[in-house]
């Protein structure tokens, strides 16, 4: 499997995020998709992993923003299965253990975390398979909408790319938009028991830096569309 990271003008946080996967033989490659960071920052990242064959680094020719860069990261993956992660979060061996604890990976399922520690706790939904057939009854759960906009999950590469839609840039509602399209296509989001990571809330996050650019009313519109699937 591939672990794919999106990043922009980050070094130390990125290195912390990547570290747990370097020695794990279950991970065939770590992809870093750099969204046209400053030249000196990209040069530092490239030098950091120059002798690490498992790490493959790509730089966009221009800044695509988070939603489109996620597609780039997945496109660069050479494995059938991909964990798409944010570069300002931290992970552990147990994150991968939880993925491999699933007896069989389903190409139409996305495996979502049950807990983005410490603030975003979705364990009330743990073990739930969410589809367009039951989203109406599940979404009113206060944490479900947050979970659908959290990403940091595991899926089939080709199915992700098939569903991905280029018609708008949802900015900070990017995960919610993709997950709406994922469910609309007849796929499932599984809140995976034991799948947890540390989700850093900070002023330099993509959300904090860009929430004002998100199209007015888009988040609420997507939640309404999910109810009506």
Q: Where on the chain are the PLM-derived regions?
A:
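Short, well-formed alpha-helical segments that are part of the catalytic scaffolds
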Residues: 10-23
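Short beta-strand/loop segment that forms part of the nucleotide-sugar
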Residues: 28-36, 58-59
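A conserved acidic beta->alpha catalytic loop
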Residues: 34-43, 62
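Glycine-rich, basic loop-to-helix element that forms the pyrophosphate-binding segment
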Residues: 60-77
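Short aromatic/hydrophobic "clamp" motif used to bind/position activated sugar donors
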Residues: 82
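Conserved donor NDP-sugar-binding/catalytic core segment of glycosyltransferases
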Residues: 96-126
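Active-site donor/metal-binding and catalytic loop motifs
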Residues: 117-118, 192-211
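Acidic donor-binding loop at a coil-to-helix junction in glycosyltransferase catalytic cores
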Residues: 170-178
């Amino acid at each position: 499997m591939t672990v794919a990271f999106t990043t922009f003008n980050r070094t130390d946080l990125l290195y912390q995020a990547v570290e747990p996967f370097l020695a794990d033989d279950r991970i065939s490659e770590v992809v870093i998709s750099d969204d046209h960071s400053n030249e000196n920052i990209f040069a530092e990242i490239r030098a950091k992993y120059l002798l690490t064959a498992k790490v493959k680094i790509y730089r966009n020719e221009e800044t695509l923003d988070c939603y489109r860069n996620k597609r780039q990261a997945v496109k660069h993956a050479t494995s059938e299965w991909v964990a798409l992660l944010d570069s300002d979060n931290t992970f552990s061996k147990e994150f991968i253990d939880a993925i491999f604890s699933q007896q069989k990976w389903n190409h139409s399922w996305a495996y979502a975390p049950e807990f983005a520690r410490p603030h975003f706790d979705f364990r009330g939904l743990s073990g739930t398979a969410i589809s367009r057939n039951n989203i109406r009854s599940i979404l009113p759960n206060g944490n479900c909408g947050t979970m659908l906009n959290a990403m940091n999950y595991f899926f089939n590469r080709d199915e992700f790319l098939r569903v991905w839609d280029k018609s708008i840039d949802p900015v900070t509602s990017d995960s919610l938009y993709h997950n709406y399209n994922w469910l609309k296509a007849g796929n499932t989001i599984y809140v995976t028991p034991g799948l947890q990571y540390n989700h850093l809330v900070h002023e330099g996050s993509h959300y904090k830096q860009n929430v004002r650019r998100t199209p007015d009313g888009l988040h609420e519109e997507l939640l309404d569309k999910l109810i009506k699937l």
